[in-house]
Structures are given as structure tokens and as C-alpha cells.
Amino acid sequence: MTAESNLKNAAEALSESEEISVLTAGISMRPMLREHKDIAVIRRKSGRLKRNDVPLYSRPGSEKFILHRILKVTPNGYVIRGDNLFKKEYDIKAENIVGVLRAFYRGGRYIDCEKSRGYKLYVFLNRASYPARYFWRGLIRPTLGKIKRLIIRKNY
């Protein structure tokens, strides 16, 4: 079973069950969720979600389901981004959301997203460090790569 079909099946399972567990896939939520190693516990969506919740949703016109963090709640929907990404998705509608991350198993350890102090600290630090990570990966690192390539070309 592919990771994509795993989440699609999860969305179908949530219509029948209150809570499900799925193996994670992809790198957009690293370092919190590791690809093919961690298990996400997702519960059916009930009511309006809040900032820092991690919904299971699909983009309009797509059958692909994704887990990303809510950055902002707007009157039109949600602004969402993966922890390991820089591009935000705007106006994700409530009808596109089928579930929300309740907890996850990391290395066999159960981490509750509502009660764990370590998880809440991770969310705070991840959000606070975003400008520095964006600056490093978006500007400094590519510039250093170009300088390195220029130096290598001149030496050969």
C-alpha cells in the first residue's frame, strides 16, 4: 500500500470510526513525524479547529490527503503549512478537512498533542524558529552553494 493510498483509506475509515491510526509518509512534517517510522493517531473532526492543530485534509480538486499544521484561522478557512515547508496554503476550507491529529507514536512512545508539554514546546520552538530557518534555507544556503560551484569551476 502506498503512503498516498494509506491516507486516502484513513479518510474513508474516519467516516466509519471516531479515531484511527496510520503510518506517516512524506517529509513535510519532519522532524515531528518521520516518514514510514511514526504512527499518527487521527480523530474525526468535530467543530472548528484552532491554531497549531494538525488537520488531515485534501486540497480542492485533489484526492490526496495531507497532514499539515494550522498557522492561522481566518473567516474563510485556514492558513496551513507543513513544519518542514516554507510555502503556506491559504483558505483551506473546513469541508476539505476530515480529521485532526490527536497523538502520535514516535519510536514506540505515545505523544498526546493536547497534554504533552514536550509537544507544546516543540510547536512553540518550531514556530519561533521559522524566520531563521527560512532565511538560512531560502537565502544563505543557496548563495553558499553558488559560491562553492564558482570556486570549483575556477579550480578546474
Model-predicted regions and their roles:
Residues 1-5, 153-156:
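Short, low-complexity, intrinsically disordered N-terminal peptides in bacterial proteins
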Residues 2-86:
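Feature for secretory/organellar precursors and membrane-associated catalytic proteins
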Residues 58, 62-156:
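Acidic/glycine-rich C-terminal interaction modules and beta/coil loop segments
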